[in-house]
């Protein structure tokens, strides 16, 4: 029997039954427990949500900027009041350690909403003089109804990253969470309504990307789609959104990011950064620095420091405050990660540690994979070229700066990159050469609300967070005023 009651769709300010009777299960990856049955939206439900969103958006956009800002700030307060409840639910649904969800996921999501709530009154047009008798003014107007499609690794945070700028700009949003982790997004919908967001301005449709996601991207009255997920799926979403009605898109896609350790680096700091860039959230972070480049002369020493730190990882029940490494998000994903590990072994990478499923005690019922480190990796190996999205680090040796920059950029992806060095000139010189949208120097992973994030190449289109993201949820209307006489050529 499921722990929670049947989860319905959230449309027009409240929970409603789906148009069909199909459901799917939310599974706790730490022990296989069925958390809830969730209704699967039908095509009719997408239309119902669009109609509700169109109605609510007109009310929302007609409010003053200060009114909208005040309501969103109230939602921030409720998020923070319910932080522990939401974190506990996120941990059950994703398997992420409670030490992450309680102190990072909900907190930083609320920070993003607070950031955009503060920017609402700053949405402005321009006045452009043409001559004494004429000028142009511009208006930044909301797009209307927009859609967000989330990934499974940061469910409520991604929902906030997408909905915060959308709602701040006066839009209504239809959000489809990942089928694997849907529960906290439904709670976010409750919070928006409680805060005073008009009915229909934030709707949640649960179900598969293949069906519900496609119906959303194809809908002619949805003006924009913001998607987070894998590159292959992102290409399909972008093609569907474009071919159906030339929708605007934001794509935050996959990565295979390089972390370059230079020969002057503090190796202890470099090892700490590499650990965070590979094993935080059990390796299920799109920006992970999974290709760790280390000078050949320092590789053995660096490997020893990594092994020392791997021993400090505390894997176990993610509801335990002392744990910092939980299961993967699902048993299906666990098998995918184990498949990549097997390929690493087959293709000649040297296994330093891990390489198997964790077993015994609490691990037997969960989707746990041991923190895994390969070394002596080469650029053509599958584990080096493809996104694994799990706790698998690949260490690669190099000899020169020119060589490592070339190899770091030799990828279809361009989401993130980082370097560790004491040389300030080298730091800026090299970071400017790396083909990636999110870069860190002597750090890894922090992504503040003010920081635009997004990828180069096949890692994405557009940006999330920062002031620029707010503009992407508006369109510009130009208006010319003529105060003088008008001369016709006819």
Curated annotation (Swiss-Prot):
Binding site for NAD(+): 150-152, 176-179, 230-233, 254, 286, 387
UniProt-listed GO biological process terms: glycine betaine biosynthetic process from choline
Co-factor binding details: Binds 2 potassium ions per subunit.
Binding site for K(+) 2: 246, 457, 460
EC number(s) from the headed UniProt entry: 1.2.1.8
PANTHER family documented for this protein: ALDEHYDE DEHYDROGENASE-RELATED
Identification of the protein by name: Betaine aldehyde dehydrogenase
Originating species: Pseudomonas savastanoi pv. phaseolicola (strain 1448A / Race 6) (Pseudomonas syringae pv. phaseolicola (strain 1448A / Race 6))
């Amino acid at each position: 029997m499921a722990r929670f009651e049947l989860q319905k769709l959230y449309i027009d300010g409240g929970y409603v039954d789906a148009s069909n009777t199909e459901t799917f299960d939310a599974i706790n990856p730490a022990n296989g427990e069925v958390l809830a049955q969730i209704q699967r939206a039908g095509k009719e439900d997408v239309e119902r949500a669009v109609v509700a969103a169109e109605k609510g958006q007109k009310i929302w956009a007609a409010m003053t900027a200060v009114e909208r800002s005040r309501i969103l700030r109230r939602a921030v307060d409720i998020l923070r009041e319910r932080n522990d409840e939401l974190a506990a639910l996120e941990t059950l649904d994703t398997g992420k350690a409670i030490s992450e969800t309680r102190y990072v996921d909900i907190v930083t999501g609320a920070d993003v909403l607070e950031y955009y709530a503060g920017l609402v009154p700053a949405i402005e047009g321009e006045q452009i003089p043409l001559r004494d008798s004429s000028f142009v003014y511009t208006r930044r107007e909301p797009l209307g109804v927009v859609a967000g499609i989330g990934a499974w690794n940061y469910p409520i945070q991604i929902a906030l990253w997408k909905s915060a700028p959308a709602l701040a700009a006066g839009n209504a949003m239809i959000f489809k969470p990942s089928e694997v982790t849907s529960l906290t997004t439904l709670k976010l919908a409750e919070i928006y309504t409680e805060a005073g967001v008009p009915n229909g301005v934030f709707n949640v449709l649960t179900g598969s990307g293949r069906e519900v996601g496609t119906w959303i991207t194809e809908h002619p009255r949805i003006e924009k789609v913001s998607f987070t997920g894998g590159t292959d799926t992102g290409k399909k979403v972008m093609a569907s959104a474009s071919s159906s009605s030339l929708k605007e898109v934001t794509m935050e896609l996959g990565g295979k990011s390089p972390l370059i350790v230079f020969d002057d680096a503090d190796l202890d700091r470099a090892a700490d950064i590499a650990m965070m860039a590979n094993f935080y959230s059990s390796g299920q972070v799109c920006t992970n620095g999974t290709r760790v480049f280390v000078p050949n002369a320092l590789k053995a020493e660096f490997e020893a420091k990594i092994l020392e730190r791997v021993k400090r990882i505390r894997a176990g029940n993610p509801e335990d405050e002392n744990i910092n490494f939980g299961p993967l998000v699902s048993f299906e994903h666990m098998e995918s990660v184990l498949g990549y590990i097997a390929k690493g072994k087959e293709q000649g990478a040297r296994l330093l540690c891990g390489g198997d499923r964790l077993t015994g005690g609490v691990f037997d019922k969960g989707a746990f994979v041991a923190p895994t480190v390969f070394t002596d990796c080469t650029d053509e190996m599958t584990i080096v070229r493809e996104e694994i999205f799990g706790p698998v680090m690949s260490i690669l040796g190099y000899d020169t700066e020119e060589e490592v920059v070339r190899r770091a950029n030799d990828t279809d992806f361009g989401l993130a990159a980082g370097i560790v060095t004491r040389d300030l000139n080298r730091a800026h010189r090299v970071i400017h050469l790396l083909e990636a949208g999110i870069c860190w120097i002597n750090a890894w992973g922090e992504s503040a609300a003010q920081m635009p994030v997004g990828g180069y190449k096949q890692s994405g289109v557009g940006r999330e967070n920062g002031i620029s993201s707010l503009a992407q949820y508006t369109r510009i209307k130009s208006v010319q005023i003529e105060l003088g006489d008008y001369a016709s050529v006819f």
